[in-house]
Amino acid sequence: SATNYEAINFYHEQFGIQRAVLPRVLALPQIEHVVNNTPVEIEVFGYGSLCVMVEGRCALSAYATGLGPNQHGVCSPAKSVVWEEKPDGLSTRLAGYLIDRFATGERAGYPTVCKGRYVVGGERYYAIEEPASLDTLALLPEFVRIGVAAIKIEGRQRSPAYVAEVT
Protein backbone atom coordinates (compact mmCIF):
# COMPACT_ATOMS: atom_id res chain seq x y z
CA SER A 1 0.00 0.00 0.00
CA ALA A 2 1.31 3.42 -0.95
CA THR A 3 0.35 6.02 1.64
CA ASN A 4 2.40 9.00 0.42
CA TYR A 5 3.09 10.85 -2.81
CA GLU A 6 6.77 9.83 -2.85
CA ALA A 7 5.85 6.16 -3.16
CA ILE A 8 3.19 6.90 -5.78
CA ASN A 9 5.60 9.04 -7.80
CA PHE A 10 8.16 6.22 -7.66
CA TYR A 11 5.64 3.76 -9.15
CA HIS A 12 4.66 6.36 -11.75
CA GLU A 13 8.27 6.95 -12.81
CA GLN A 14 9.36 3.30 -12.70
CA PHE A 15 6.21 1.54 -13.95
CA GLY A 16 4.07 4.23 -15.55
CA ILE A 17 1.08 3.88 -13.25
CA GLN A 18 -1.73 6.30 -14.07
CA ARG A 19 -3.98 5.83 -11.02
CA ALA A 20 -3.42 4.83 -7.40
CA VAL A 21 -5.96 3.74 -4.80
CA LEU A 22 -5.14 5.15 -1.38
CA PRO A 23 -5.68 3.11 1.77
CA ARG A 24 -8.86 4.01 3.61
CA VAL A 25 -6.91 4.86 6.78
CA LEU A 26 -5.77 8.28 5.49
CA ALA A 27 -7.43 11.48 6.70
CA LEU A 28 -8.71 14.13 4.28
CA PRO A 29 -5.68 16.46 4.73
CA GLN A 30 -3.35 13.53 3.98
CA ILE A 31 -5.31 12.68 0.83
CA GLU A 32 -5.19 16.32 -0.28
CA HIS A 33 -1.41 16.40 0.28
CA VAL A 34 -0.98 13.33 -1.95
CA VAL A 35 -3.28 14.71 -4.68
CA ASN A 36 -1.38 18.02 -4.71
CA ASN A 37 2.02 16.36 -5.09
CA THR A 38 1.59 13.72 -7.78
CA PRO A 39 0.56 13.61 -11.44
CA VAL A 40 -1.11 10.23 -10.80
CA GLU A 41 -4.91 10.15 -10.54
CA ILE A 42 -5.95 9.35 -6.99
CA GLU A 43 -8.84 7.06 -6.09
CA VAL A 44 -10.15 6.75 -2.53
CA PHE A 45 -12.46 4.32 -0.80
CA GLY A 46 -15.94 5.72 -0.34
CA TYR A 47 -17.54 2.82 1.46
CA GLY A 48 -16.43 -0.42 3.04
CA SER A 49 -15.02 -2.15 6.05
CA LEU A 50 -12.46 -0.45 8.27
CA CYS A 51 -9.44 -2.34 9.56
CA VAL A 52 -6.86 -1.94 12.32
CA MET A 53 -4.10 -3.01 9.95
CA VAL A 54 -2.70 -0.78 7.21
CA GLU A 55 -4.29 -2.15 4.07
CA GLY A 56 -2.47 -4.98 2.39
CA ARG A 57 -0.41 -5.62 5.51
CA CYS A 58 -2.67 -7.84 7.59
CA ALA A 59 -0.26 -9.66 9.85
CA LEU A 60 -3.11 -11.58 11.50
CA SER A 61 -4.44 -13.07 8.27
CA ALA A 62 -0.92 -13.76 7.01
CA TYR A 63 -0.05 -15.53 10.27
CA ALA A 64 -3.21 -17.65 10.27
CA THR A 65 -3.14 -18.63 6.59
CA GLY A 66 0.49 -18.24 5.55
CA LEU A 67 -0.79 -16.04 2.72
CA GLY A 68 -0.03 -12.33 2.95
CA PRO A 69 -2.69 -10.02 1.49
CA ASN A 70 -0.16 -8.11 -0.65
CA GLN A 71 1.05 -11.27 -2.37
CA HIS A 72 -2.27 -13.10 -2.53
CA GLY A 73 -4.67 -10.20 -3.01
CA VAL A 74 -6.95 -10.56 -0.02
CA CYS A 75 -7.24 -10.77 3.74
CA SER A 76 -8.86 -14.06 4.80
CA PRO A 77 -8.56 -15.79 1.41
CA ALA A 78 -11.67 -17.77 0.48
CA LYS A 79 -9.70 -21.00 0.05
CA SER A 80 -8.80 -20.80 3.76
CA VAL A 81 -12.38 -20.18 4.97
CA VAL A 82 -14.60 -22.98 6.27
CA TRP A 83 -18.25 -22.56 7.24
CA GLU A 84 -19.48 -25.33 9.58
CA GLU A 85 -23.23 -25.67 9.93
CA LYS A 86 -24.15 -27.43 13.21
CA PRO A 87 -27.43 -27.96 15.07
CA ASP A 88 -26.61 -25.10 17.48
CA GLY A 89 -25.58 -22.66 14.75
CA LEU A 90 -22.77 -21.77 12.38
CA SER A 91 -19.03 -21.73 13.05
CA THR A 92 -16.56 -19.92 10.83
CA ARG A 93 -12.91 -20.90 10.63
CA LEU A 94 -9.90 -19.44 8.89
CA ALA A 95 -7.15 -21.98 8.18
CA GLY A 96 -8.50 -24.10 11.03
CA TYR A 97 -8.72 -21.26 13.57
CA LEU A 98 -12.19 -20.68 15.00
CA ILE A 99 -13.09 -17.07 14.18
CA ASP A 100 -16.72 -16.88 15.31
CA ARG A 101 -19.84 -18.82 16.20
CA PHE A 102 -23.31 -17.65 15.24
CA ALA A 103 -26.62 -18.78 16.69
CA THR A 104 -29.15 -20.34 14.34
CA GLY A 105 -30.66 -17.50 12.31
CA GLU A 106 -28.00 -14.96 13.37
CA ARG A 107 -26.43 -13.04 10.48
CA ALA A 108 -22.85 -14.12 9.85
CA GLY A 109 -20.20 -11.85 8.38
CA TYR A 110 -17.19 -12.91 6.37
CA PRO A 111 -14.59 -14.32 8.78
CA THR A 112 -11.61 -12.06 9.38
CA VAL A 113 -9.30 -12.56 12.34
CA CYS A 114 -9.50 -8.93 13.48
CA LYS A 115 -13.32 -8.87 13.55
CA GLY A 116 -14.00 -12.30 15.03
CA ARG A 117 -15.75 -12.72 18.36
CA TYR A 118 -13.65 -14.60 20.88
CA VAL A 119 -14.12 -15.90 24.41
CA VAL A 120 -11.65 -14.02 26.60
CA GLY A 121 -11.81 -14.31 30.38
CA GLY A 122 -15.10 -16.18 30.06
CA GLU A 123 -16.68 -13.34 28.08
CA ARG A 124 -17.52 -13.48 24.36
CA TYR A 125 -16.84 -10.25 22.48
CA TYR A 126 -14.89 -8.60 19.67
CA ALA A 127 -11.47 -8.83 21.32
CA ILE A 128 -9.52 -7.00 18.61
CA GLU A 129 -11.93 -4.69 16.79
CA GLU A 130 -15.69 -4.32 16.45
CA PRO A 131 -16.84 -4.31 12.84
CA ALA A 132 -17.14 -0.74 11.58
CA SER A 133 -17.77 0.70 8.15
CA LEU A 134 -16.36 3.63 6.27
CA ASP A 135 -19.03 5.87 4.73
CA THR A 136 -17.70 9.01 3.06
CA LEU A 137 -20.94 10.22 1.48
CA ALA A 138 -20.72 13.49 3.43
CA LEU A 139 -17.14 13.99 2.16
CA LEU A 140 -17.95 13.76 -1.56
CA PRO A 141 -17.92 17.57 -2.07
CA GLU A 142 -14.51 17.73 -0.36
CA PHE A 143 -13.18 14.90 -2.55
CA VAL A 144 -14.27 16.86 -5.63
CA ARG A 145 -12.73 20.07 -4.27
CA ILE A 146 -9.31 18.50 -3.62
CA GLY A 147 -9.21 16.67 -6.96
CA VAL A 148 -9.86 13.02 -6.13
CA ALA A 149 -10.37 11.26 -9.49
CA ALA A 150 -12.58 8.35 -8.42
CA ILE A 151 -14.40 6.78 -5.49
CA LYS A 152 -13.95 3.06 -4.81
CA ILE A 153 -16.67 0.93 -3.26
CA GLU A 154 -15.41 -2.23 -1.63
CA GLY A 155 -16.53 -5.35 -3.43
CA ARG A 156 -13.89 -8.03 -2.90
CA GLN A 157 -15.03 -10.76 -0.49
CA ARG A 158 -18.56 -9.40 -0.72
CA SER A 159 -21.69 -11.08 -1.98
CA PRO A 160 -23.59 -9.79 -5.02
CA ALA A 161 -26.37 -8.81 -2.59
CA TYR A 162 -23.95 -6.61 -0.61
CA VAL A 163 -22.60 -4.92 -3.73
CA ALA A 164 -26.12 -4.32 -5.05
CA GLU A 165 -27.20 -2.81 -1.72
CA VAL A 166 -24.34 -0.31 -1.46
CA THR A 167 -24.29 0.74 -5.10
Place the predicted regions along the sequence by residue.
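Active-site pocket-lining/capping segments in soluble small-molecule metabolic enzymes
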Residues: 1-6, 21-150, 157-167
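Structural motif
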Residues: 14-15, 146
